[in-house]
Amino acid sequence: MSWQRPDNRTAAQLRPVSFERHFTRYAPGSVLVKFGHTHVLCTASVAEEVPPFLQNTGQGWLTAEYRMLPGATQQRQPREMLKLSGRTAEIQRLIGRSLRAALDFRKLGSRTITVDADVLQADGGTRTAAITGGYVALHDAITWLYKQGALDPAQGSPLRQQVAALSVGIVQGEVLVDLCYEEDSQAEVDMNIVMNEQGSFIEIQGTAEAACFSRPQLLQMLEMAQAGIQELLQAQRQALNLER
C-alpha cells in the first residue's frame, strides 16, 4: 500500500509556496517565505566590515544564523541562549554555504551580509525554506546596496546565480518531494538538495534513517528534487519581478 500524503499531494507536487517581500521595515532585505505550513522569516542585513581573515583583501562575506521560535512547533521548545544545539549549528552552516554560492565576493566589496532565518512555524523543510527565502532577501539587500550607491553597476552584480533548496525522501518505499513533518518523521530516507539556476548541485545531504537506498532510488530522488527546485526558482523570479 502506497503512502497517502496528508494534504493529498502527488509524489512530485510541492506544497503551496509564497514569498512576502519587504516584510520588516529596517533590514535591507526581508521576506516571509511559506512552504505550506512552514513559515520562515528571512532577513538580510549589511555591515561595512569583514571577518579578520578577509581584511585588506577587498572581498566581502556572507554568514547566516538560524533559530526556531519556541512556539513554532506543537510542543514548545526552549530558546537557545548561550549554546546552540548541534542541529541549529548544522542548519545555519548549510544556509551560509548555500547562499555564499550565489555571490561573487570580489564584486560585493569589503562588507558582510548576514542572513537571519527565524522559523515562525515548522511543518518540515525549514532549512530548505530558509535557503530559498534567504536568496530572495539577499537579492533585495543587493538591490538596496545599489540604491545606496555602495555598488558600481559598471562592475557587474555580486549576484552570480540563483539558489534554491528542496527536501526529498522515501516514505513507505515511495519517493516524495517537499516532505511535511508527518512525512519526514516516517521517512526511511531523508535528503536536502540545494541547486543553482543552471541545474548544478551546491549541496546534497542524504541519510538512510530507517532503510538503505539504491542507486536507482538516489537518481530518482535527485531528478524529482531538480524538477521541484526549478519550480522554486521560477517562484523566486516571479516574486522578484524577474520572470523569464
From Swiss-Prot:
Pfam families membership: RNase_PH (PF01138), RNase_PH_C (PF03725)
Full protein name: Ribonuclease PH
NCBIfam families linked: RNasePH
EC number: 2.7.7.56
UniProt entry keywords in alphabetical sequence: Nucleotidyltransferase, RNA-binding, rRNA processing, Transferase, tRNA processing, tRNA-binding
Molecular function GO labels: 3'-5'-RNA exonuclease activity; tRNA binding; tRNA nucleotidyltransferase activity
Family: Belongs to the RNase PH family.
Reaction(s) catalysed by this chain's protein: tRNA(n+1) + phosphate = tRNA(n) + a ribonucleoside 5'-diphosphate
Physiological role: Phosphorolytic 3'-5' exoribonuclease that plays an important role in tRNA 3'-end maturation. Removes nucleotide residues following the 3'-CCA terminus of tRNAs; can also add nucleotides to the ends of RNA molecules by using nucleoside diphosphates as substrates, but this may not be physiologically important. Probably plays a role in initiation of 16S rRNA degradation (leading to ribosome degradation) during starvation.
Subunit structure: Homohexameric ring arranged as a trimer of dimers.
Organism: Synechococcus sp. (strain JA-2-3B'a(2-13)) (Cyanobacteria bacterium Yellowstone B-Prime)
Listed InterPro entries: ExoRNase_PH_dom1, ExoRNase_PH_dom2, ExoRNase_PH_dom2_sf, PNPase/RNase_PH_dom_sf, Ribosomal_Su5_D2-typ_SF, RNase_PH, RNase_PH_bac-type, RNase_PH_CS
Lineage per the UniProt record: Bacteria, Bacillati, Cyanobacteriota, Cyanophyceae, Synechococcales
Binding site for phosphate: R87, G125, T126, R127
GO BP annotation list: rRNA catabolic process; rRNA processing; tRNA processing
SUPFAM superfamilies: Ribonuclease PH domain 2-like (SSF55666), Ribosomal protein S5 domain 2-like (SSF54211)
